[in-house]
């Protein structure tokens, strides 16, 4: 009876009774006395040549012998590598001074890209990186090139009940052709709604940068399952509607820090959207920081926003194309006892010199007792009373302000174009980057009320270093 046919691509199965014999053969092979590589190589050649010669005249039999030899060599190499990794893991465990729980805590503080790089270093780090706590604060902004919807879903599900913050998209964008289209859109947030919104309810901070196209329905659906969110930042909004603010009013009343930035030509905020925005601020009792960049706010809307939130300490309305500053004097009369400490009005093309001067005088008379910082810096100066003219050297009573209100920092820098000095929209580094990249193409002329092109501004290509260390988010460590 012929023996059963064996696949030429597999190693012959050794019966259980022969395991010890096989182990002895392999042990004998591994204990081969030291010799020169050339001598060992020649020995292999001789033995293999004899085995092929004595096997059969049939080439297929010889082919199977060669394939089997190659597979044995491959298995030996794989086994050696596994042993090496085990030894390295034991070494790391003995030499790594932090206990696993503290290592997990450190990993949870890294951005997601850095954590994944650490995870592929060794088995010990990989095990630590699989803990849910490591995904409490998901930051994929440093790996936007690779982070598609599937990656986001995997990360959110890994975090599970430990999910606390989520940052997605590209922080910095540049003008020009879109050479690397973003992989994410508003629909990437759909995993937050799974299991009746359980994951979304765990979220405390959500920051989205330039997700396009972003559908308001998808965004509002995601926000509707995040009732405990306290920090919301969305950069790259377009066509502001009351739908977004209505959703925030109904579902996200615990927000303490709200940051919204639009792109494209900022139009005057529509009445419905403005009313919905004021309603949200009015019904958000914990709101202490409000940033609305490039919003087409009128002075009336700006005053209503400041008056509607009594706990507001930080207000940033930079790059508004419509604010003239009249709301400042009105605010001084109606909000003498409010808590506002910081007011930022950078790069507002219609902000008038006379209104800022009136504001300074209001400070000197004792209004705005809580104010500590004001910034009205602009790359193009302030609007002068003479129509069409700009003022780069306004006559503000700064010396008197320093003497009588030494607790106030008043910033009013208006660099000339030739100086090359540019001012951002906020104190935070990431927003200074945005301003630096967009300042050349995004300054709005005072007399220009025509619609600008609505072509999307492309995202900046990531550094080529992103390709290092296998940061395509290896599937072995994501699934």
Swiss-Prot record:
UniProtKB keywords: Nucleus, Ubl conjugation pathway
GO CC term, one of those recorded: nucleus
Subcellular compartments: Nucleus
Protein name according to UniProt: F-box protein SKIP17
Domain F-box stretches: 92-138
Record function comment: Component of SCF(ASK-cullin-F-box) E3 ubiquitin ligase complexes, which may mediate the ubiquitination and subsequent proteasomal degradation of target proteins.
Pfam families reported in the protein's UniProt record: F-box-like
Chain positions covered by the region annotation Disordered: 435-479
Quaternary organization: Part of a SCF (ASK-cullin-F-box) protein ligase complex. Interacts with SPK1B/ASK2.
Domains as described in the record: The F-box is necessary for the interaction with ASK proteins.
Main location: nucleus
Pathway, per record: Protein modification; protein ubiquitination
Gene3D superfamilies: Ribonuclease Inhibitor
Keyword Transmembrane helix attributed: no
Signal peptide: none
GO BP: protein ubiquitination
Biased composition (Acidic residues): 437-469
Coiled-coil blocks: none
InterPro entries assigned: F-box-like_dom_sf, F-box_dom, Leu-rich_rpt_Cys-con_subtyp, LRR_dom_sf
């Amino acid at each position: 009876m012929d023996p059963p046919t064996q696949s030429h691509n597999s190693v012959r199965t050794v019966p259980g009774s022969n395991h010890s014999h096989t182990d002895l053969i392999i042990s004998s092979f591994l204990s081969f006395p030291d010799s020169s590589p050339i001598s060992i190589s020649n020995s292999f050649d001789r033995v293999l040549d004899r085995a092929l010669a004595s096997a059969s005249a049939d080439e297929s039999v010889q082919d199977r012998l060669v394939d089997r030899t190659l597979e044995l060599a491959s298995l030996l190499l794989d086994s050696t590598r596994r042993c090496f990794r085990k030894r390295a893991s034991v070494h790391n465990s003995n030499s790594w001074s932090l206990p696993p729980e503290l290592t997990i805590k450190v990993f949870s503080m890294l951005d997601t890209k850095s954590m994944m790089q650490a995870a592929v270093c060794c088995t010990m780090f990989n095990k630590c990186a699989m803990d849910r706590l490591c995904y409490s604060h998901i930051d994929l902004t440093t790996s936007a090139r690779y982070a598609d919807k599937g990656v986001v879903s995997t990360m959110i599900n890994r975090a599970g009940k430990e999910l606390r913050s989520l940052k997605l998209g590209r922080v910095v964008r540049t003008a020009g052709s879109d050479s690397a289209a973003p992989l994410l859109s508003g629909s990437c947030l759909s995993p937050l709604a799974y299991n009746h919104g359980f994951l979304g309810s765990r979220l405390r901070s959500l920051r989205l940068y330039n997700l396009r196209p972003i559908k308001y329905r998808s965004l509002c659906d995601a926000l509707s399952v995040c009732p405990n969110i306290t920090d919301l930042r969305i950069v790259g909004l377009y066509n502001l509607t009351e739908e977004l603010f209505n959703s925030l009013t109904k579902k996200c009343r615990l927000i303490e820090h709200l940051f919204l930035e639009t792109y494209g030509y900022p139009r005057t905020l529509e009445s419905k959207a403005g009313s919905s925005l004021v309603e949200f601020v009015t019904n958000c009792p914990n709101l202490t920081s409000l940033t609305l960049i490039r919003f087409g706010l009128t002075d009336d809307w700006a005053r209503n926003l400041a008056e509607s939130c009594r706990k507001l300490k930080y207000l940033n309305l930079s790059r508004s194309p419509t604010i003239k500053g009249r709301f400042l004097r009105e605010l001084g009369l109606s909000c003498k006892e409010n808590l506002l400490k910081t007011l930022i009005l950078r790069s507002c093309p219609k902000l008038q010199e006379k209104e800022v001067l009136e504001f300074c005088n209001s400070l000197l008379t004792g209004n705005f007792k809580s104010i500590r910082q004001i910034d009205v810096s602009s790359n193009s100066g302030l609007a002068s009373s003479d129509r069409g003219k700009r003022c780069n050297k306004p006559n503000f009573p700064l010396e008197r302000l320093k003497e009588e209100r030494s607790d106030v920092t008043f910033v009013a820098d208006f660099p000339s174009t030739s100086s090359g000095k540019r001012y951002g929209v906020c104190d935070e580094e990431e927003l200074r980057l945005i301003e630096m990249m967009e300042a050349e193409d995004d300054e709005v002329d005072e007399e220009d009320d025509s619609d600008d092109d609505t072509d999307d501004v492309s995202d900046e290509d990531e550094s080529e270093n992103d390709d290092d260390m296998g940061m395509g988010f290896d599937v072995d460590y994501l699934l």
